[in-house]
Design a protein with these regions (language model features):
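Hydrophobic/aromatic beta-strand patches that form the interior of the parallel beta-sheet core
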Residues: 2, 30, 105, 166-168, ...
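Solvent-exposed, acidic/flexible segments
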Residues: 8-15, 50-58, 82, 142-146, ...
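Cap/lid segment of the alpha/beta-hydrolase catalytic domain
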Residues: 36-52
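Serine-dependent carboxylesterase/thioesterase catalytic core
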Residues: 4-5, 29, 47, 55-154
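C-terminal catalytic-base region of ester-bond hydrolases, centering on the histidine
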Residues: 160-242
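Short, surface-exposed "cap/lid" segments of acyl-processing enzymes
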Residues: 1-38
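Extracellular/periplasmic catalytic domains that process cell-envelope and extracellular macromolecules
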Residues: 22-24, 71-72, 80-81, 96-100, ...
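Short aromatic-enriched loop/helix-cap "lid" or pocket-rim segments at secondary-structure transitions
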Residues: 41-44, 115-120, 177-181, 206
Length: 242
């Protein structure tokens, strides 16, 4: 299994709670840091990754996944992506097909871009895209709703045949907005389950930044990966970061 972090994040901050639970459930868990080249201000901050363009980041993920399959002696693996990580999984599947991937789980994936609570729309309207790129990185530009990258990625649909998708969104997402834009539509040969984290558990108020630490989100992930298909989903408070 490969875990894929999001923008301005790293593998530890993103999955410090989820990764051990997946390991205890019997998975071999792999992750890595990607997406930094020193060309933007955000990427200069220690521990901050995922700032470079999504096409190149997807290539990094494809290479890492191939290495994991080779070392594990596996023909297929599962992938879990948070935020940009979910979109990169789609990038890999679209470029390389779904033959090497079994199950996919995404948490607050920016699959269709984001308005960033309106900020991305404003930046585009006032012509601040170049400033955004210099400060926040190409990843921020690529994930704007209607960007060239997102338009090309979704031109032939959201999914690829042969892959089982579980897509988790949170009502309190302030980064991927509107939050339902994370949800996917199944194409031929694919299965999609779109899940709002708060359905059946109103006390979990996880936002974009905290949802990978939500016990309920972790349980949904384990169930989707068939690591825990019989247990009930935990319903516990999980606070937002913002």
């Amino acid at each position: 299994m490969v875990l894929v972090h999001g923008t301005y994040a790293n593998q530890y901050d993103s999955f410090a709670r989820m990764a051990p639970e997946l390991k205890w459930a019997g998975y071999c868990v792999y992750s890595f840091n990607y997406g930094t080249d020193g060309t933007d201000a955000a990427g200069q901050i220690p521990g901050v990754y995922g700032t470079t363009g999504l096409s190149g980041n997807g290539d990094e993920l494809a290479a890492f996944a191939a290495t994991v399959r080779e070392r594990a002696g596996a023909s297929k693996l599962d992938m879990v992506g948070w935020s940009q990580g979910g979109t990169l999984i789609t990038d890999v599947l679209k470029k390389h097909g779904g033959g090497g991937v079994d199950d996919v789980v995404t948490l607050a994936g920016s699959h269709h871009g984001t308005t960033l609570s309106g900020l991305a729309t404003i930046a585009e309207a006032v012509g601040a895209t170049d400033l955004t790129r210099a400060g926040l990185g190409q990843a921020a530009v690529d994930q704007m709703q209607g960007s060239e990258y997102i338009t090309a990625l979704t031109a032939d649909g959201d999914t690829v045949p042969g892959v089982d998708y579980t897509v988790i969104g949170t009502k309190y997402d302030e980064v991927v907005t509107p939050y339902r834009s994370t949800f996917l539509t199944a194409g031929p040969g694919a299965t999609v389950r779109n899940i709002t984290l708060q359905d059946g558990c109103a006390i979990d108020v996880s936002d974009h930044l905290s949802m990978t630490h939500s016990p309920r989100a972790i349980d949904i992930t384990k169930r989707a990966l068939k690591a825990d298909g019989s247990g009930t989903l935990r319903c516990l408070p999980n606070a937002p970061v913002l």
